[in-house]
Each structure stands twice: as C-alpha cells, then as structure tokens.
C-alpha cells in the first residue's frame, strides 16, 4: 500500500527497490529470522504484483500465506517497476528472471562489467549501481573521505566483505577488517588500496569525478546512483556535487 500511495503522489514515477538485507541486520537489529532470502524475495515480488492488480489474493507460498487480501486503494498503475538489490549469484539470477531492474552496490568494476554482459545477453533489464561518491576541490580530501566510507562498509558489512574477498580483494578486506577488530575505525581506512578505491568509488575533484563516473557507465550501468558523502560543510559539499554532475 505504501508503494501504491507513493506512486499516486508521484504521478506514476515510482520505481520500487527491494532487498532482503542481511542476517546481522534482520536478526540482531530487528529480531526476525533470516532465512530463504531468494525464495522470500521471489514471493515478495509475486505478492506485490498481485496486489497492484487489485484482484483478491489467496496466496500459498513457502514463506508467505495470504487469504482474501485486496488492496484498499486504487493504484495509479497496475504495474510498478520493481528493481532488486543483488549481490550473490542466486539473487542476481533471480533478479534477471523476475525483476525490471537490478541495484548493485560495492561491486568491482571489472566483475560488474562481466556480470552485466553475461546477464544482459539472456534478457535485458535496467541496471543501476549505487556508488560511494566524494567530490572536493581538494582531491586528497575526497579520497580520504571515500576511503573512510569504504573501510566502514567492509568492516561492518560481512556480506560485502565476503563478496569483495572473493572478487579480487582478499588481502585488502582481510587487512581492513583485521585492523578494525584491533583499533576500530581509527586507521583502517589507510589500508584501502588505490586499486580498490578506483574499482568501487568516485573520489576526486569535479573533473576527475566526472571522468570516473564515465567508467561506471561504460561498464554497462544504465543509471548510476550517486551516494553523497559530504566533505566538511555539508551544504557546500552538496552544492559542489550538483554542480559537478548536473551542470554542463
């Protein structure tokens, strides 16, 4: 109902992004059981599409059961585009099977290019990727901020750490996480290598950042999603970000 409402308010412009999250967040933060993420996502999508059709739903899945459910409001559209967040192979395969688009995050450029080429040859969907982005007139400040953000996700996000370890950055992830366990976030960003930074982030002055964005586009991404990371003054930093990417 929330998605249908936002689609009405936005005059049919909503794209619904869905993700199953990870075991630590679901179980430790929310107190729920994390199980069967691929099957759970498959049923999410089936149920949402049935609900938007305004038909009465009687659904019996392996995860969810619904009896006599009908959406109470009249949706703007009978079909809202659904994009799925995907990291590992099973979720990537499901996404290309049932979704309108995919949302990638912290995926090395070369690996992402190979995955997009392989999957798009089977069926074309929209490809998006959220990219850690730090823009400053001082390139070194931008790079430092990006390294700290990347080190944070590697330290606390086991699913990203494991994926990156299997895809070209085994030593880096091991070292960054090891230092995090010893001293927290004090200095583990210093272990982010130039290769890792260039493969996963946009960081630099405005001209450098625009060039780096093009690398991600060239990998097959249709819609880069800029993850804003402010440097010093947030308002000024956001103004520079807009000037960099939105103004010719």
Model-predicted regions and their roles:
Residues 1-248:
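Active-site-adjacent structural elements that line small-molecule/cofactor binding pockets in enzymes
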